[in-house]
């Protein structure tokens, strides 16, 4: 018989508001491959259990609803800053080729467009600068990637604000819980494989679909969003921004087919030819995935964290550390070497443990540089700050003094940092590093930082004020001040928005800004 569930407790600890500490009852689900001949009923499938969570009509806690609004503001901030970048312009042009009478909104422009294509364009805009929220555990995730597809569907179907919030809370919960339990990168599978099912589950909650429909939508979404991590390896291309947008678009289409009565490959995770057996750890391995027990509130969004700096999340604390260290070092020309002791994930994904020579190439793409901790640490050390455009400018990367310092920096895995990275207690998790700076004199300067300043446990944690400041700063010169304030007012009242009013979440960009976007050659969609 299938493995039984075991109840476990997770503690939520938030430094900015101790009263929010609480205990949630979670069910820990054993997930492994089964042979087709085995007795493995549908009700035991992981997709079915996720569908149960999605269909559970629990209330949304006020602080959770507030955080949803924060992340909508955060996405809008990053989208505004990315409006004239080439990948965003390409995705927008594709979406504008799909107008419909009663559709969704494309960020920055007027009109009504097919929800799947609007989600595509808005997903690329939100992801392009690698500047919105993150959750790190067994795998990596950017759960705000769920926002564009759910908002697009809500706009096309006239869903009210409260239902949109419910859907996003589910999407965050499922995305984060899968990230806690199933490691994808170990098997070179891209982390959008957790996003597709989360989008399907979130839409299911938002539309109050039945459990069976959600189950099939989840199965289809996972089946179609498993891809390799080559998108984040070596010379990283603009597809890194398109990948989550594609998963969101696929998730919408999966729900649409399931609503029309179509089924899905099953059991998608556990099948003899399924994801675990052939794409992940194989038939001998058992994963353990936590999900809220029936009736339990969905609060996982509160365990995620946004970015103050436009770079891979595991570089957030090192950037703050570099800014702090520069005053102690003084003359940077006196540096002989810098070794960053950090977690396994950080070492192999953005550090020298990746073995990617492209991470030291002054002519590398922006996407490659934002996954190069040696480059990021060097620039932050020299400038004492980080900027989403100036820090990546080609002339900045090619500066001779930067290249020289950059090549003095390496990373090593430290078992203690790896342990803290995977710690189940949010109050003890750490995503930082210890820097050992050796000067030509032989002096060694050592400092470390566990979490970024903007992290909930950091020195300057992000709250609504900081989210709004990030939006107004990045939207400056892109979105008129009156439009900025209109958008923020709509977000503030999201829970009270009636059917049809969610379209107000779109932000219109000054047409003169869009005129600066690169000229894109025509494609198939016109």
From Swiss-Prot:
GO function term, MF aspect, one: 2-methylcitrate dehydratase activity
GO cellular component: cytosol; peptidoglycan-based cell wall
Record's catalysed reaction(s): (2S,3S)-2-methylcitrate = 2-methyl-cis-aconitate + H2O; citrate = D-threo-isocitrate
Name of one Pfam family that matches: MmgE_PrpD_N
Pathway note: Organic acid metabolism; propanoate degradation; Carbohydrate metabolism; tricarboxylic acid cycle; isocitrate from oxaloacetate: step 1/2
Keywords in alphabetical order: Cholesterol metabolism, Lipid metabolism, Lyase, Steroid metabolism, Sterol metabolism, Tricarboxylic acid cycle
Gene3D superfamilies: 2-methylcitrate dehydratase PrpD (3.30.1330.120)
Role, per record: Involved in the catabolism of short chain fatty acids (SCFA) via the tricarboxylic acid (TCA)(acetyl degradation route) and via the 2-methylcitrate cycle I (propionate degradation route). Catalyzes the dehydration of 2-methylcitrate (2-MC) to yield the cis isomer of 2-methyl-aconitate. Could also catalyze the dehydration of citrate and the hydration of cis-aconitate.
Self-association state and partner proteins as the record states: Monomer.
Additional note from the record: The vitamin B12 restores growth of the prpDC mutant on propionate as the sole carbon source. It suggests the capacity of the MCM-dependent methylmalonyl pathway to support the metabolism of propionate independently of the methylcitrate cycle.
Record-stated family: Belongs to the PrpD family.
Name the UniProt record assigns to this protein: 2-methylcitrate dehydratase
Species name: Mycobacterium tuberculosis (strain ATCC 25618 / H37Rv)
Source organism phylogeny: Bacteria, Bacillati, Actinomycetota, Actinomycetes, Mycobacteriales
């Amino acid at each position: 018989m299938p493995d039984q569930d075991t109840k476990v407790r997770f503690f939520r600890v938030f430094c900015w508001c101790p009263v929010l500490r609480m205990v949630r009852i979670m069910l820990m689900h054993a997930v492994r491959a089964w042979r087709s001949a085995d007795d493995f009923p549908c009700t035991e499938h992981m997709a079915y259990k996720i569908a149960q969570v999605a269909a559970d009509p629990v209330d949304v806690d006020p602080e959770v609803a507030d955080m949803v609004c924060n992340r909508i503001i955060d996405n809008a901030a990053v989208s505004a800053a990315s409006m004239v970048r080439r990948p965003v312009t390409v995705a927008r042009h594709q979406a504008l080729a799909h107008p419909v009478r009663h559709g969704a909104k494309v960020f920055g422009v007027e009109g009504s467009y097919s929800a799947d294509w609007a989600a595509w364009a808005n997903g690329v805009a939100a992801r392009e600068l690698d500047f919105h929220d993150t959750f790190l555990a067994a795998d990596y995730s950017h759960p705000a990637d769920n926002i564009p597809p759910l908002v697009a569907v809500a706009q096309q179907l006239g869903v009210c604000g409260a239902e949109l919030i419910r859907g996003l809370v589910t999407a965050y919960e499922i995305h984060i819980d899968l990230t806690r339990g199933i490691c994808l990168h170990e098997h070179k599978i891209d982390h959008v494989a957790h996003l597709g099912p989360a989008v399907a589950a979130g839409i299911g909650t938002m539309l109050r679909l039945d459990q069976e429909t959600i189950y099939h939508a989840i199965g289809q979404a996972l089946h179609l969003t498993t891809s390799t991590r080559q998108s984040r390896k070596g010379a990283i291309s603009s597809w890194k921004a398109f990948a989550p947008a594609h998963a969101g678009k696929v998730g919408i289409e999966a729900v649409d087919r399931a609503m029309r009565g179509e089924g899905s490959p099953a059991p998608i995770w556990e099948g003899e030819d399924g994801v675990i057996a052939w794409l992940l750890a194989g038939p001998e391995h058992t994963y353990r995935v936590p999900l809220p027990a029936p009736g339990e509130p969905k609060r996982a969004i509160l365990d995620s964290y946004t970015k103050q700096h436009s770079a891979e999340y595991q570089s957030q604390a090192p950037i703050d550390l570099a800014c702090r260290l520069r005053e102690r070092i003084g003359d940077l020309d006196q540096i002989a070497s810098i070794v960053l002791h950090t977690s396994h994930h950080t070492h192999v994904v953005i550090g020298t443990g990746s073995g990617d020579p492209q991470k030291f190439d002054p002519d590398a793409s922006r996407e490659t540089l934002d996954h190069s901790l040696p480059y990021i640490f060097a620039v932050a050390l020299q400038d004492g700050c980080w900027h989403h455009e100036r820090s990546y400018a080609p002339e900045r990367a090619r500066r001779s003094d930067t290249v020289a310092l950059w090549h003095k920096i390496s990373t090593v895995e430290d078992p203690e940092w790896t342990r803290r990275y995977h710690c189940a207690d949010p109050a003890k998790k750490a995503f930082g590093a210890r820097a050992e700076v050796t000067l030509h004199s032989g002096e060694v300067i050592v400092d470390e930082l566990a979490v970024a300043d903007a992290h909930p446990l950091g020195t300057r944690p992000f709250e609504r004020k900081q989210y709004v400041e990030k939006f107004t700063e990045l939207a400056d010169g892109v979105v008129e001040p009156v439009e900025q304030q209109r958008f923020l007012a709509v977000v503030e009242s999201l829970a009270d928005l009636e059917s049809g009013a969610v379209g107000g979440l779109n932000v219109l960009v000054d047409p003169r800004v869009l005129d600066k976007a690169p000229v894109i050659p025509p494609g198939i969609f016109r």
